[in-house]
Amino acid sequence: MLGDGNEGMSTIPGFNQIQFEGFCRFIDQGLTEELIKFPKIEDTDQEIEFQLFVETYQLVEPLIKERDAVYESLTYSSELYVSAGLIWKTSRDMQEQTLFIGNIPLMNSLGTSIVNGIYRIVINQILQSPGIYYRSELDHNGISVYTGTIISDWGGRLELEIDRKARIWARVSRKQKISILVLSSAMGSNLREILENVCYPEIFLSFLNDKEKKKIGSKENAILEFYQQFACVGGDPVFSESLCKELQKKFFQQRCELGRIGRRNMNRRLNLDIPQNNTFLLPRDILAAADHLIGMKFGMGTLDDMNHLKNKRIRSVADLLQDQFGLALVRLENVVKGTICGAIRHKLIPTPQNLVTSTPLTTTYESFFGLHPLSQVLDRTNPLTQIVHGRKLSYLGPGGLTGRTASFRIRDIHPSHYGRICPIDTSEGINVGLIGSLAIHARIGQGGSLESPFYEISERSKSKKVRMLYLSPSRDEYYMIAAGNSLALNQRIQEEQVVPARYRQEFLTIAWEQVNLRSIFPFQYFSIGASLIPFIEHNDANRALMSSNMQRQAVPLSRSEKCIVGTGLERQAALDSGVTAIAEHEGKIIYTNTDKIILLGNGDTLSIPLVMYQRSNKNTCMHQKPQVPRGKCIKKGQILADGAATVGGELALGKNVLVAYLPWEGYNFEDAVLISERLVYEDIYTSFHIRKYEIQTHVTSQGPERITNEIPHLEAHLLRNLDKNGIVMLGSWVEAGDVLVGKLTPQTAKESSYAPEDRLLRAILGIQVSTSKETCLKLPIGGRGRVIDVRWIQKKGGSNYNPETICVYILQKREIKVGDKVAGRHGNKGIISKILPRQDMPYLQDGRPVDMVFNPLGVPSRMNVGQIFECSLGLAGDLLDRHYRIAPFDERYEQEASRKLVFSELYEASQQTANPWVFEPEYPGKSRIFDGRTGDPFEQPVIIGKPYILKLIHQVDDKIHGRSSGHYALVTQQPLRGRAKQGGQRVGEMEVWALEGFGVAHILQEMLTYKSDHIRARQEVLGTTIIGGTIPKPKDAPESFRLLVRELRSLSLELNHFLVSEKNFQINRKEA
């Protein structure tokens, strides 16, 4: 982006820039900062000293390529080498060696890391900035209670509160509080120093009685009193060093370490001049905070808004990786100390190489990327998803909030989010408002503040230069910021005399001369997902939120298509996602193929490999298609190959299809969608999906498992696709139940376990019974497809710990079908309810049948009118062969600008194509269309158009499930839950009431016994189903009732149940 003093317009920053900058900051500064903190380590006799030389650390280039790391399930990392020295103090000798400390996972060109073959991304966290915050709350009597909350760098809190008698307390937990005098004395101040350093000493003296004086008579007394209140379990503690250490560890270290940012905030808020390197809370801070609190009580000073972004900080990738590096060095320090002591004890001569091991660093990073809540598996459904995932901001995670405890106020939009955090793009459900998305131009500045760019209005200086400023949330409050964006920076354009502006979180209307800054871009306050919605200003924010989330779920289609109506950001999104192949040098194409492009430039030939049918972790297909012919001269930065869901270097997530808005026989009731068979037969919404199935071979106690094609337990039909090694052949078509990898596991069978006739037959005929069981990899239900890749990965080392892995990749071609979910870009989503023959679909006046029929009742109540504008403009663009790229909020140029644009384009289309039905003045945008079944026109004119419709990842093939019988839970003996476990459907309390209401007693009994947890009855059902006959009625209670009885018995409640016979109603007592 342009810096200060540059002319012209700003450019859109790289969407992955935040991730790259964070990682570079960690490598350049974070590593050095943590290595400098590594202490000199001495042995107990202080004869040997070990130290690291920070000036010379090296990161080695990775030995493997990114693609190989993914396929072989390895980590794409760099080895870290640091020089270390061992000094013998007696002889003053020093031994210096370069040591391998461990592996640090590197960031690749997508802004992600590859750990154990999986793409992972670290998302940024928003935390409360350390410092002090004053707020007031009403107590149960309606009286204002003022509190000052000190937040430490670790997230620990210490609250100062003032009561009705003007006494000041320090609250260390919800139940415990101590006098501020005791706390100050425990921190090392005496009474005289306290009274000298406060503005209101008489208030402090007013609550000082004899008991208090005794408590603060000496530092030891104060510490004892503090310990008794805060950490003591019972008894009378005695002052000692261990007591001080425990208090230091439990309280002061967690709640009193402010860090550099906290010290800066503290000094600024309390008008102190304590040096920046003094990062701990001092008695002086506590007393100044108490003074401010007393001032608040008497109406002086201002309260703080905890939710303002100036009181938040961003914990970026750099901070998280640096914290983990520091943790690894602490572990390394403990290892080195232990090794030195062991070597001295056993009279061995240590060397730096022997003292240091790479395990602490490598395992710390592996566990961080694998287990930390902010390290997530990269969502790669489509190119947009990849970029958006790295730009998320989360309030959740260590030191943050939880979905259960976060209040509405925290989740809400705040005026300081303007241009920094998108007001639309957030997750739905329990985390709404807690996971946000960065605005397009926002960046992370010094100290973790979010900065947004503005243009400085420099008409007063009469210069033609345009200065761009990046302002943090604390600075932009003091400027008048014009809300109008600057697209054309021509100084001669006469601005309006009165403009809307923002000042100190208020929106005003002021004269143009008073404006200091102006926004730089119409999309400045939106995230990437929201910026891809055309006519977003005509939509309700809830629907825009759904749309920005659903675009991330769009499946890349086999034949992608550019949108007719877009916003202009599609090219940038596709470029930054890294799915397209781009020329790094200019030159001439000398060879092109499906797997590589060879480029000749500056006398060198450069081979550019293309991605071929690569699986993403959402099982979508990533594939690159060459876009340049042989012999063509190209320039640097030109697109050589399109990736998944891109066309000509632009993002293309869906298709432009002909849509009509009308109810059709109830088939589009409640957001259902009716589609034409053309979408199926012409592969318009066909997508490819790649599934990965893997199996490992282990060495068991009976011997190693074998991969073989000779499986005596299975019929030959299931093994038809196996080669001589027992692995499925490339290119073969496999159905559910087929064996992909044949595997036998050895097992020992005792002689006594065979039936006597078995033993006799084996003795007579000499038959060898198989001593192994089959543990083959079989294709699960719904997995049919073509085998496109097989990989046999053999890891180095012993096979016990590193088993061989065989991965089979199967490609599925999925057409659109009933039950699939489709959506537009305005939150208009629906499930396909019926696929009609094209002759039955409603058709236009030129005879074209429509492709989809949406329900018009889904528009007015949801207030997403943008879809109607897009629909009509798409029709005009299709007829005129034009593509439109429209920035949002065009009503600022003139009233009804969007409607005028759409109508003028429709009018032009009707003139050029000589089709008057395209624009009919009586009902503009609508047209009379005909019922395909009868040929009669519908009663009213209908809106028709060409919107951009996406097919989403929620597909019926992944969700449909049925079960006759299957696995049962061990304790309750009821069917398991969920599709993955072949589970059954639960008939719960309310379902039982519904069946009772209809009086279907036999169905209800089946549901609660045979089909559920009556063990004997369900076995008899299977038997009678095979043999024939009537199913006997169950005579005893089901297993869940027995379980209830047992659980009550564990509570010492004896419960017996009785069965009353139908004939004579005598009570037959049965033992439960």
Curated annotation (Swiss-Prot):
In plastids the minimal PEP RNA polymerase catalytic core is composed of four subunits: alpha, beta, beta', and beta''. When a (nuclear-encoded) sigma factor is associated with the core the holoenzyme is formed, which can initiate transcription. It comes from Eucalyptus globulus subsp. globulus. One of its GO terms (cellular component) is mitochondrion. Its EC number is 2.7.7.6. It holds the Pfam family RNA_pol_Rpb2_6. It is found in: Plastid, Chloroplast. It catalyses: RNA(n) + a ribonucleoside 5'-triphosphate = RNA(n+1) + diphosphate. PANTHER family: DNA-DIRECTED RNA POLYMERASE I SUBUNIT 2 (PTHR20856). InterPro entries: DNA-dir_RNA_pol_bsu_ext_1_sf, DNA-dir_RNA_pol_su2, DNA-dir_RNAP_su2_dom, DNA-dir_RNAP_su2_hyb_sf, RNA_pol_bsu_bac, RNA_pol_bsu_CS, RNA_pol_Rpb2_2, RNA_pol_Rpb2_2_sf. Belongs to the RNA polymerase beta chain family. Keywords: Chloroplast, DNA-directed RNA polymerase, Nucleotidyltransferase, Plastid, Transcription, Transferase. GO terms for biological process: DNA-templated transcription. GO terms for molecular function: DNA binding; DNA-directed RNA polymerase activity; ribonucleoside binding. It comes from the Eukaryota. The keyword Disulfide bond does not apply. DNA-dependent RNA polymerase catalyzes the transcription of DNA into RNA using the four ribonucleoside triphosphates as substrates. This is DNA-directed RNA polymerase subunit beta.
